[in-house]
């Protein structure tokens, strides 16, 4: 399927309507190409049309919109020192209806919706019993179900970012110029209808060439999330119903129990392409700089935990113009100011756009929960081949005389370390000075006991999130930006958290914790599993390789009391409210950075409180209206009201409040 998707990248932007505001008929769009409308009356043409409906899925991962619209402006991340698009993190006046990402989200999703509408109508009308592809009703039903699942998904993305949007579910037979916004409740009715209708005709999952297509697991996962989002509303009006949480539980359980998808045994198996291969050399000796290999990325992409992902190709001839670029935005500046380090493929191209907040670092149990060290890179291994200018062992600090004059760090050994010690365990600067590493960044340090605690963490020296690290990429050019990881939209761990939250919202905290603890059992250190020495050197943890499952389990007291480990906002006073914040914390621990956070905070009506509390970069202009994005100006100037261009008054009425 990926091959076909990439072949038609050039095609769909011309043939199919890219934005809902276009008034051209389908036949007029066709005339600018060598194809005719008749091509889409053939089974091959209809197959290509279906596949074209997947192309807009890639947009999220192809540039800086990825983090801007999901991770910036939340409690999890703040700005690095080379920040772009700061308006999404600070919520300043530059976030407005002229914004390129707002327009891109709108046009890409409506491009997908348009293709879905066309495919649904044309396939329903197709009648050729001799067709190998669409000759039976079951074959037609399968493709129509795919398109309905995608349409529901695209509308779900839209309603979470914009609120009410125009609902278009047919291909207009005449030019259309007016697109009134439906209410949020009406959009959710459409989303739920599409995803419900799609599920029964789809297979639970694909395991080979068709991986990446919509499946029943995909439809029901997002159906559960749609019910959860609608039913989470307290002050917002989303058309919520008393049965929404029951529906969440029903569909999420169906995915968990019947889809054939399974959690990875090791949390790190989802992201292992970013982890180093190789052996640290003996002191004074050179080894090899860390490497990865394409097989690890292929394994990450093929994980059975992944329910739905945008597909990216590693074939230069088939790849999109941008491919997956999310690996660019999280690395710290390791290639300057870190002796022994230079830019390489393994550590990535450090755009330094965003760094984790203190909340994000503190919310993990670093001693018992492996997710922290499998999410954040704390060690950089020397990759500079020349010893010139690098510190050597002296007679005063060499562990044995044979090492005098040799580099303190050989190639492949630890050149720099980020120590994530807690504030109540600061490291003395004299201790840091005696470490053999070329660079040490302590989160908490002091010159002497009782003196002020300071930090080495900064806007360009911070913890790198390596979930999206891509040490292979499309070419071997050192600054190659086009990655080859797929872009994950849904994995089974999220389904577990969705069903857990639904049970908790119904007051069944015991069942909620059962699902949470399934993930915590997975992420606990196993007996003899390697772990960071920081645990016992700087955090007060035990110097053992014991199983930590028992210590990693969540208990009721984490939200029935004001547990210090959960960092609850001071305004949160009830068990019910603490449970919601506990689930947000659990989503950070499991899903940090995976492009959910802004929508999670909006869904739970906590965006304003949590972002103000934990993100030091937000501006004073950050306000409640920022829970929605502005409607693109391009949409408004391209349509009419009662046959006339939109007036300023019409635009103000059409626009979201505050913009």
PLM feature spans:
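Acidic, glycine-rich segments characteristic of secretory precursors and extracytoplasmic regions
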Residues: 2-4, 23-78, 89-92, 96, ...
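Long, intrinsically disordered, low-complexity segments
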Residues: 20-26, 54, 95-96, 109-112, ...
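Short coil/turn linking the two alpha-helices of tandem helical-hairpin repeats
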Residues: 157-160, 164-166, 229-238, 507
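C-terminal substrate/ligand-recognition segments
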Residues: 99, 103, 370-374, 378-524
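An aromatic- and glycine-enriched ligand-binding surface/loop that stacks and positions planar moieties
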Residues: 24-84, 229-434
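Conserved, well-structured interaction surfaces
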Residues: 43, 47-60, 81-162, 176-189, ...
């Amino acid at each position: 399927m990926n091959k076909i998707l990439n072949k038609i990248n050039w095609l769909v932007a011309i043939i199919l309507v890219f934005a809902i505001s276009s008034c051209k008929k389908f036949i007029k769009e066709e005339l600018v190409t060598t194809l005719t409308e008749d091509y889409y009356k053939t089974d091959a043409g209809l197959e290509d049309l279906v596949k074209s409906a997947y192309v807009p899925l890639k947009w999220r991962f192809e540039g800086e919109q990825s983090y801007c619209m999901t991770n910036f402006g939340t409690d999890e991340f703040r700005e690095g020192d080379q920040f772009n698009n700061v308006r999404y993190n600070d919520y300043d006046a530059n976030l407005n209806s002229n914004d390129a990402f707002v327009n891109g989200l709108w046009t890409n999703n409506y491009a997908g919706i348009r293709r879905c509408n066309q495919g649904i109508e044309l396939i329903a009308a197709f009648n050729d019993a001799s067709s190998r592809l669409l000759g039976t009703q079951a074959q037609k039903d399968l493709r129509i179900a795919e398109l309905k699942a995608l349409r529901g998904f695209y509308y779900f993305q839209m309603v979470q970012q914009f609120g009410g949007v125009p609902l278009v579910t047919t291909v207009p037979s005449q030019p259309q110029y007016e697109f009134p916004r439906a209410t949020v409740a009406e959009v959710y009715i459409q989303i739920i209808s599409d995803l419900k209708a799609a599920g029964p005709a789809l297979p639970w999952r694909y395991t080979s060439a068709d991986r990446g297509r919509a499946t029943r697991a995909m439809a029901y996962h997002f159906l559960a999330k749609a019910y959860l989002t609608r039913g989470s509303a307290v002050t917002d009006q989303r058309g919520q119903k008393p049965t929404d949480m029951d529906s969440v539980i029903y569909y999420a359980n169906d995915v968990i129990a019947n889809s054939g998808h399974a959690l990875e045994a090791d949390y790190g198996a989802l992201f292992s392409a970013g982890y180093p291969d190789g052996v640290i050399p003996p002191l004074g000796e050179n080894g090899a700089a860390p490497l990865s290999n394409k097989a690890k990325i292929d394994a990450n992409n093929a994980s059975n935990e992944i329910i739905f992902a945008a597909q990216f190709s590693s074939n230069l001839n088939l790849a999109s113009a941008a491919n997956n670029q999310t690996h660019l935005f999280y690395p710290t500046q390791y290639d300057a100011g870190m002796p022994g380090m230079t830019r390489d493929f393994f550590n990535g191209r450090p755009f330094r756009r965003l760094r984790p907040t203190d909340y994000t670092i503190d919310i993990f149990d670093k001693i018992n929960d492996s997710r922290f060290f499998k999410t954040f890179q704390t060690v950089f291994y020397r990759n500079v081949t020349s010893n010139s200018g690098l510190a050597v062992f002296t007679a005063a600090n060499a562990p044995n005389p044979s090492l005098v004059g040799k580099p303190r760090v050989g190639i492949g050994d630890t050149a720099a370390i980020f120590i994530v010690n807690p504030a109540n365990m600061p490291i003395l600067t004299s201790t840091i000075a005696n470490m053999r590493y070329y660079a040490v960044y302590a989160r908490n340090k002091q010159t002497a006991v009782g003196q002020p605690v300071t930090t080495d963490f900064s806007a360009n020296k911070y913890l790198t999130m390596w979930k999206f690290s891509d040490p292979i990429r499309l070419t071997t050019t050192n600054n190659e930006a086009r990655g080859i990881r797929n872009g994950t939209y849904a994995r089974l761990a999220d389904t577990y958290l969705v069903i857990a939250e639904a049970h908790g919202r119904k007051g069944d905290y015991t069942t909620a914790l059962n699902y949470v603890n399934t993930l915590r059992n997975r992420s606990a250190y196993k007996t003899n599993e390697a772990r960071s020495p920081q645990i016992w050197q700087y955090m007060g943890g035990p110097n053992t390789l014991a199983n930590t499952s028992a210590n990693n389990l969540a208990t009721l007291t984490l939200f029935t009391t004001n547990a210090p480990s959960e960092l609850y906002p001071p305004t949160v006073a009830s068990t019910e409210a603490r449970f919601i914040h506990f689930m947000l914390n659990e989503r950070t621990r499991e899903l940090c950075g995976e492009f959910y956070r802004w929508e999670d905070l909006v869904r739970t009506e906590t965006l304003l409180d949590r972002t103000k509390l934990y993100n030091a970069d937000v501006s004073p202009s950050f306000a409640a209206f920022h829970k929605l994005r502005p409607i693109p100006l391009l949409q408004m100037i391209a349509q009419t009201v009662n046959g006339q261009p939109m007036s300023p008054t019409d635009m103000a009425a059409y626009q979201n409040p505050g913009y």
